[in-house]
């Protein structure tokens, strides 16, 4: 109930900010005084999110990586992990292709509107920072973890966190370390929950921040923001529809030789639950029941593959993040190259591991993407303000996509492994 109330509050704050901002923009009045008073309330929200994003990702990735199956699950566990990785990778690539195609924030009129934004930081400076060579990017992934934490080098933080979590999982199988590793993971889990509580507090403040950010953005740039909003929404929804109705069915048809739409019809209940609740955790019990009763999947695989998927598989989010990245690139004059797109895809896929259970997880991942683009705090605030406004709508589709991907993966691996009790 609290979550629904918060969503409603954020939506009302967004609409109120939009209306007030457009009225001020149409009135052609001097808004410098208004911006000076109201803007800090939005900046505080961005600052709090920036404060919490590194510990959230660091602890979540360690916990997520430490929970992946190792040799006790054998080939089946490996198949599940590989399937999740490949679908997330495909979703990130699809999202990038759609983002380039829709190109939100482009066009002469909008470029003129963004001109004042581009001047807030030297364009060539941003481009030189954001478009390093692929070799430079690869080397930076293995930076000293403490320096990476201090510098905000998210790729290095992600790589180290995943490696550390996997290492903990490996040494936990040795008798002399199993108890110590269990204790350490319990401490990490408690620390993660404490951080999540802070995230809840920040999200409770978010309606105020959303109102401030939205009203200032629309008061400054008016109708030029409507085009990007429409393109973003259409692009993300189109990508998710493509994943659910084209990509997943093709994967099942090719690998399993079954009618994929019969499978999708059987899982419509968890899909609808995910769409309505915007929560993979809320849909998980329904997914487990449907997997057992309707898809006839052995509990030996569904009991670990589905919970694991709700943690590490975020196909829907992998589609929408590139949209905001391209919008930011257009707004702030960042040149998009093959290298920068490759880094975007890699960062999106790696960062999604462990972020599924994070409150406002997609927003945290957006911060990573924008930080990686070397944008200034003011520029990040503008993009985050735009994202917060439509996040509740996009989140419904993304969560449905995530849950669908989890079940399709589980069913496909089970079918290939002979762990489906009845033939379709």
Predicted segments with their positions:
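Membrane-embedded alpha-helical segments of transport systems
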Residues: 82-94, 153-161, 205, 309-320, ...
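Signature of multi-pass transmembrane helix bundles
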Residues: 7-11, 18-26, 30, 34, ...
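Membrane-interfacial loop-to-helix junctions in multi-pass transporters
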Residues: 49-51, 152-156, 203, 238-239, ...
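Transmembrane alpha-helical segments and their short flanking loops
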Residues: 107, 322-424
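Transmembrane helix boundary and interhelical junction motifs in multipass membrane proteins
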Residues: 53-57, 209, 279-287, 318-324, ...
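Helix-loop-helix junctions within the multi-pass membrane cores of secondary transporters/permeases
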Residues: 269, 275-352, 410, 420-423
